[in-house]
Amino acid sequence: MKFVNHIEPVAPRRAGGAVAEVYAEARREFGRLPEPLAMLSPDEGLLTAGWATLRETLLVGQVPRGRKEAVAAAVAASLRCPWCVDAHTTMLYAAGQTDTAAAILAGTAPAAGDPNAPYVAWAAGTGTPAGPPAPFGPDVAAEYLGTAVQFHFIARLVLVLLDETFLPGGPRAQQLMRRAGGLVFARKVRAEHRPGRSTRRLEPRTLPDDLAWATPSEPIATAFAALSHHLDTAPHLPPPTRQVVRRVVGSWHGEPMPMSSRWTNEHTAELPADLHAPTRLALLTGLAPHQVTDDDVAAARSLLDTDAALVGALAWAAFTAARRIGTWIGAAAEGQVSRQNPTG
């Protein structure tokens, strides 16, 4: 598939079973099959759960689609993911929110009068516990928190597996393409969809405590519980690698990693030599996806020797970091509610 590196997604013409169902749903509701979704297809369980978290956060619910695209675009910009920024700003044009799109593309804050401004500021700051307060109430918190966590997850995978952008040409041509894409997808962005449709093929799973922020929305909670269970039980990464990554991510507070990727060496040194490369790749994917090189991926292939194993390992690492972010933005949002509604 064009634009995808290191793996071969399932081609639409060869898709069957749940993969074909997800592809059809995505085309119907997005207007096309997005590469960041197709890249999950070597692992059918990951694709079905990943589609559910994507759909139930971004495409349905009380919060307007355009507002969620602004949140997703701001998260993408904070991670310096050009593909993601191009995709979400195109959808902002489709939603008619051109000022928000222009500000994010320019790397500036939206104007004070832009209704999306506080949401963009919040989303841009979700990468650290010191971000601005949430500008939303508890009735829609799961939608906003889920959108932010979803795109902290997906953007990390995109940075490793996809080209820098899908737009051809230079800046002027790319801007024209974004606006043209906005016209193409305008009807899809404004369409309303019924919550929960993507979760019907998922088995019920227990929602982990660190994802408790999703509880108020049954479809979002079901989707994230399924994704968490699938990634945590997949066999692709051995327990010693998972233990190291969980420990390092668990002590991370959003600070940028050193510019040299040698920071991983102190964490892999304790492991057997054959686990150094996959552990390094997992650490980089979660905490410094820009530092992942083709050589890093190739070196990890000795253990991650299938496309399903590679995408599953990368997804687990990316989701581990996104879950960590979810703990602090979820706690901050809950704390705001507690302060606004004191008891006693």
UniProtKB/Swiss-Prot annotation:
Secretion signal span: none
Effect of loss of the gene: Disruption mutant is sensitive to oxidative stress and exposure to toxic transition metals. In a human monocyte (THP-1) cell infection model, mutant shows reduced uptake and intracellular survival and increased expression of pro-inflammatory molecules, including IL-1 beta, IP-10, and MIP-1 alpha. In a guinea pig model of pulmonary infection, mutant displays growth attenuation in the lungs. Knockdown of the gene leads to increased sensitivity to peroxides such as cumene hydroperoxide and hydrogen peroxide.
Phenotype when changing residue 84 to S: Loss of activity
Active-site residues, Swiss-Prot/TrEMBL: 84
Keyword tags: Oxidoreductase, Peroxidase, Virulence
Presence of the UniProt keyword Oxidoreductase in the record: yes
Alphabetized Gene3D superfamilies for the sequence: AhpD-like (1.20.1290.10)
Any GO molecular function: peroxiredoxin activity
Entries under InterPro entries matching the protein: AhpD-like, AhpD_core, CMD-like
The EC number(s) this enzyme carries: 1.11.1.-
Stated family: Belongs to the AhpD family.
Name of the protein this chain belongs to: Alkyl hydroperoxide reductase Rv2159c
Lineage: Bacteria, Bacillati, Actinomycetota, Actinomycetes, Mycobacteriales
